[in-house]
């Protein structure tokens, strides 16, 4: 059985540190992609009293959040009109991505006789989603003056927040500051938000009314310098499994598909029941490490859909069937941390964690 163990104390402490850092800004907690692989239900249940908003990528994720909490939920993605009636009934916040969205929303709101909460997503330079920068002011004004729309927020997203010196940051910040000025002239109550985790860590001046600390709450820090208080943030989860079988190799034996790993006579190999079918990175096969009783062991051979193997050498530490295996550590410097695993396979921690699927149990402790 594979379990992602989540520390409620660490989760709570991370939010507390961020809260102190951003001052009066609200916290909108992104829990998209199954809370970056940590489990929407488990994370929302244990944080809804600590944050002001939640954010998700789509309607179906939003419904999972509203089943647990009455806190506002913002959907970042496009509007799926087949789900809009339920979204409106549950007061889920919709993102306007184009000026024409307003007319469609007004028509549906009239039919339902219920106002729709919206946040206008502004394309300040990322060029992925959002209202065109040159079309923003009329979109804001139209939404603000609508009888059927409640303009709750205006936001954008930084394309290069992980690189503080990238020139795109200055361009986007300048554009968004102009938008904020326009929106606030209409109403001081409009919530303006720009910064994800790396955004406000790189520039504390752009917290505005709300920040969106996703990866930071889950415990992953940027590689650029941050203040000492932020360095107290820790990963909230460990991925654990157990040894289910130990095999002794004979001379010439290989392990796993294609026999890419060849052991030595008498070598012990442990079988762990987790594989790429669980969302564990296949690229780590024959490259990654696991921790058994505070000893690091290398993976041996290709990872399969449902299992991986590790070399115990001569098994000097007497690893046994049933021993706990730590696959992902909550200590960043460990070779099996999400941070160093990501480095090994040329990806990011978000990718390592968010691909873990529902074959893995989530447990908050």
Swiss-Prot record:
InterPro entries: Ala_racemase, Ala_racemase/Decarboxylase_C, Ala_racemase_C, Ala_racemase_N, PLP-binding_barrel. One of its GO terms (molecular function) is pyridoxal phosphate binding. Keywords: Isomerase, Pyridoxal phosphate. CDD domains: PLPDE_III_AR. Pfam families: Ala_racemase_C, Ala_racemase_N. Its EC number is 5.1.1.1. The modification N6-(pyridoxal phosphate)lysine is found at residue 32. Disulfide bonds: none annotated. It is an enzyme of class 5 (isomerase). GO terms for biological process: D-alanine biosynthetic process. Pathway: Amino-acid biosynthesis; D-alanine biosynthesis; D-alanine from L-alanine: step 1/1. GO terms for cellular component: cytosol. It comes from the Bacteria. Its cofactor is pyridoxal 5'-phosphate. PANTHER family: ALANINE RACEMASE, ALANINE RACEMASE, CATABOLIC-RELATED. Catalyzes the interconversion of L-alanine and D-alanine. May also act on other amino acids. This is Alanine racemase. It comes from Francisella philomiragia subsp. philomiragia (strain ATCC 25017 / CCUG 19701 / FSC 153 / O#319-036).
